[in-house]
Amino acid sequence: SFAYVPIMQSIAQDADVGTILGAQIVGGIVAIIVGIFIKQIRHLFPPLVTGTVVFAIGLSLYPTAVNYMAGGAGSADYGSWQNWLVAIITLAVVTGLNHFGKGFLKLSSVLIGIIVGYVVALGFGMVDFSSVLTAKWVQFPQPMHFGIKFEPSSCVAIAVLFAISSIQAIGDFSATTTGGMDRMPTDEELSGGIIGYGVSNIVCAFFSGLPTATYSQNVGIVSSTKVVAKRVFGIAAMIMLVAGIMP
């Protein structure tokens, strides 16, 4: 999740990826604790609070987004007009389809924007297929490739973010069940979702995966389609797993 990027960049400069992964495990444990006691603390986080948290997280990502639009830190052509043109075209397509599109076009606005941006970048010769051509068809992740280290200050910083993201999850789950099922989530549903969020991040750390979140952008898709069947999300998860081992 981009919500962790600023903190992870700071940790990476002073330490390494293994330190981030160790802190991620601690953060996952914090999320599990929040999930276990969600029934007792839920009243402390009304929609006004959770909505504000989601909004604040979104605002904090603008510097990272602008940096990526310029080409990414360390890029030889950082800030070039080609980078900005590709970024602006992609942004315009996503925004236009999201606001004015209907049905499939609206739901697929991000995917279509990526495809359009990719085609434009291809025209500028900004796409290098050499790594794709040399990559194996199937490649499994190596557990603990970067190792796992526990550094107190890093653990505290990431743990705080996980606690905040757990509160964001309350807002995400509430908006999802309201939009998809016309009701608020039960305490058991919130607890299971947040505990699952924590467990998945702990497992993810052992496979060198960086922190994830509950992703507010998916709320709109569920609200629009009303699709909440576990089978659908299970199939989507399997597709992602297969994509993960086919770089």
Question: Model-derived features: where do they sit?
Answer:
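Short, non-helical or kinked segments that cap or interrupt transmembrane helices
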Residues: S1-F2, H43-T52, L105-I112, L210-N218, ...
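Early transmembrane hairpin of solute transport permeases
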Residues: S1-L85, T225, M246
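Hydrophobic alpha-helical transmembrane segments
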Residues: V5, V17-I25, W84-I89, L107, ...
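Hydrophobic core segments of alpha-helical transmembrane domains in multi-pass membrane transport
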Residues: P6, G27-G35, T52-V66, W84-F100, ...
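Interfacial segments of multi-pass membrane proteins
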Residues: Q9-A12, N98, N218-F233, M238-G244
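C-terminal ends of transmembrane helices
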Residues: V30-H43, V94-G103, I170-G179, S216-S224
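Helix-loop-helix hairpins and the membrane-proximal interhelical loops
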Residues: S75-D77, K106-S191
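Membrane-embedded helical hairpins/re-entrant loop segments and their flanking transmembrane helices
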Residues: A159-K230
